[in-house]
From Swiss-Prot:
The keyword Glycoprotein applies. Its main location: Golgi. The chain crosses the membrane at residues 26-43. Involved in the synthesis of glucuronoxylan hemicellulose in secondary cell walls. Gene3D superfamilies: Spore Coat Polysaccharide Biosynthesis Protein SpsA, Chain A. This is Probable glucuronosyltransferase Os03g0287800. The lineage of its organism: Eukaryota, Viridiplantae, Streptophyta, Embryophyta, Tracheophyta. Glycans are attached at N78, N165, N257, N287. Coiled coil: none annotated. It is a single-pass type II membrane protein. Keywords: Cell wall biogenesis/degradation, Glycoprotein, Glycosyltransferase, Golgi apparatus, Membrane, Signal-anchor, Transferase, Transmembrane, Transmembrane helix. Residues 1-25 are cytoplasmic. GO terms for molecular function: galactosylgalactosylxylosylprotein 3-beta-glucuronosyltransferase activity; xylosyltransferase activity.
């Protein structure tokens, strides 16, 4: 019996040993599976690797991808074109910021045209590739209407205002616009808005290629500008005289007068007397870093505060002093890409005086005030550009007297 007991104890120990071996194998197998799964999760997808490798190699995989895109229809083709354009933009690198400064007028005659002109400029700027910042400056009383308009443009903008008051005479002399430009440049300098600054008036017309040329400016850029005066039937072209993209001087010519001489001046032409005293702000652009250049304050003595503290005059002066830093736009300056439209100050003053007279006459006729004003605005747009001042006053008199009391309100001896 003792021997049988001994055999039974040996068999139990054998079963326990085999059971522990099974547990060890299962634990080892589970550990290996866990480790393999853990590291496999960090590995990239093999399918995406094969696809990208085939496309990049330009082999069979690439041809299959192209055929499938052409077979899916127009929508896929349009998306592929957009992707190609985006890829081209990425390859070209980040583009410099364009800061477009637009000034307005606070005079009564300009209030009704401001919204239409701002809308026109907004449509133009929306065609320019980003990044672009539109800086609009205007007097404080006109803020609300313009703010609503700017919010609907879809452009990145900054709306600047000021509380300074300017008379009609100051506005006609350009003092208000000059102040607005300094307000804009002060904002750019204060916030260090790095980019290329362009002054664009509400009546200006630009070639869209012009904005691509602006992004190539490193310090200063200048271009020929055609100024069209509708009232004087006159077209004057002014701008840099270039050799390739280098500026050698400045020229001015009257295209409406075939016998008018071409004035050319500058260091490259040996005619310093013809060098303009001051550049038109619509004829150049500059890198905004010039505004916070430390050399700015040491360039001019304190006896000339306009050149050191007046930002607009400072930039105008620097452009004229150093031609080597000015880039001609386009190359050879052989094309007019910016056009300005002006109205003579004499006719503007006459129009304002006539409006003041009409407003006095309409004080007792408030019910027809809006009708008469609409007729006057229509007259201004249609006849004003081709009308002499004396004739304009007579036309306004005739229209106003006719629409108030059938022509009997004013004396016919006025004209």
């Amino acid at each position: 019996m003792g021997s049988s007991t001994d055999h039974g104890g040996a068999g139990g120990r054998g079963k326990k040993g085999s059971g522990s071996q099974l547990w060890k194998k299962a634990l080892l197998h589970s550990s290996l599976c866990f480790v393999m799964g853990f590291f496999t999760g960090f590995a990239p997808s093999s399918v995406s690797d094969w696809t990208s490798a085939a496309v990049s190699a330009g082999g069979v995989g690439s041809s299959h991808v192209v055929r499938s895109l052409h077979a899916t229809g127009g929508a896929a083709v349009n998306r592929s074109l957009l992707a190609q354009a985006a890829a081209g933009a990425v390859d070209a690198g980040p583009q410099p910021l364009l800061v477009v400064v637009t000034t307005t007028e606070s005079t009564p005659s300009a209030a009704g045209q401001r919204a239409a002109a701002l809308t026109r400029m907004a449509h133009t700027l929306r065609l320019v590739p980003p990044p672009l910042l539109w800086v609009v400056v205007e007097a404080n009383p006109d803020v609300a209407a313009t703010a609503r308009l700017l919010r609907t443009t879809g452009l990145m903008y900054r709306h600047l205002t000021y509380k300074d008051n300017f008379t009609v005479a100051d506005a006609a002399a350009g003092k208000e616009r000059h102040h607005q430009r300094n307000v804009a440049l002060g904002h750019i300098e204060h916030h260090r808005l790095a980019g290329v600054v362009l002054f664009a008036g509400l009546g200006d017309t630009f070639d869209l290629r012009f904005f691509d040329q602006l992004r190539q400016i490193r310090t200063f850029g200048a271009w020929p500008v055609a100024t069209m005066s509708q009232n004087e039937r006159k077209v004057v072209v002014q701008g840099p005289a270039c050799s390739s993209s280098s500026v050698a001087g400045w020229f001015s010519m009257d295209l409406s007068n075939a016998t008018s001489p071409v004035a050319v001046g500058g260091a490259g032409y040996g005619a310093a007397a013809a060098r303009p005293r001051e550049l038109d702000v619509h004829g150049f652009a500059f890198n905004s870093s010039v505004l916070w250049d430390p050399e700015r304050w040491g360039r001019y003595p304190t006896s000339e505060p306009d050149k050191s503290q007046d930002s607009v005059k400072f930039v105008q002066q620097v452009v004229l002093e150093d031609y080597s830093k000015v880039r001609g736009i386009p190359s050879d300056c052989s094309e007019v890409m910016a056009k300005l439209r002006t109205v003579s100050q004499q006719l503007e003053a006459t129009w304002r005086s006539a409006l003041a007279i009409i407003n006095e006459l309409l004080r007792a006729c408030a019910s027809v005030h809006g009708h008469v004003r609409s007729k006057l605005d229509s007259l201004y747009r249609s006849d004003f550009p081709q009308t002499e001042p004396e004739t304009l006053i007579c036309l306004i008199h005739d229209h106003a007297s006719h629409y108030i009391y059938g022509g009997r309100f004013l004396s016919g001896d006025f004209c």
